[in-house]
Amino acid sequence: MSLLHGVGDFFALDIGTNSIRMIQLSGNAEKGWTLDKFAYVPVDQKITKDDSETGKRKLGEIILGAREQAGIKTKNIAIGLPARKTYTAIIEVPNAPQRELTQTVKYEADQYVPMSVDEAKIDFAVLGISPNDAKKAEILLSSTDNAYAESVMESVEQLGLNVIAQEPEPIAMVRALAPVGVQDARMIIDLGETSTDLVVMYQGSPRLVRSIPGGLLSFVRTVENSLKVRDDQARQFILKFGLAQDKLEGKVFEALRWR
């Protein structure tokens, strides 16, 4: 199993705070992708945060129900790993053939991975020659706690599915949203319910990957308190009007402006 790569016929699963999403595509990176299957199911966050066997069973039933709803037949699955559970960095190592790079990265990883290398699942991708030193290669290094990765895989495989890949959500976001061939600097942001992932792109590759606490829920609370409205109303205002200054007399914009 690879942390970064999925191959063959498969579908992808993303378990969020209050929903699950799954998608199956056809095609390839060169010719383009086509959406084949898709499912979105709201989930009580008490279930997604419940690590008990009962909670896992309920979540598993929802996942299988969503798969059936989407009409997905393949059992091969790629799972998104939350950014807060992964560590991603760009490092530079002496340029060398792939086999030697593998050994070098394993050695160098100990300096970057915020856990014991023996307790981590580590994968990497070669981005190319370093713009700072032609004798070095730029490496996208990604890691997660091995016990966590194995726990997630075990829970999913108990549903009769075959995990072929686990990928950090920020990296999946880059592959899905980053424009192909764009070389200038771009920032891609994913505003989640309780945290926000951001990736800075340059010359077609991620250069900075971060997950920061605070997400949509923080905005909802701010608007709720400022406009004296219910939680569901505040959420609707934000999703419908955003930061538009000409909507709702600019009240949502003003509430979030100085947050």
Region annotations inferred by a language model:
Residues 36, 207-209:
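A structural motif specific to WD40 beta-propellers
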Residues 13-20, 82-84, 188-196, 201-205, ...:
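A short acidic Gly-Thr/Ser loop motif
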Residues 1-108, 150-152, 160, 184:
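Non-catalytic, solvent-exposed interaction/assembly segments
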Residues 101, 229-237:
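Small-residue helix-packing motif on alpha-helices
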Residues 76-179:
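Active-site neighborhood for divalent-cation/phosphate handling
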Residues 234-259:
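Adenine-nucleotide phosphate-binding core of ATP-dependent small-molecule kinases
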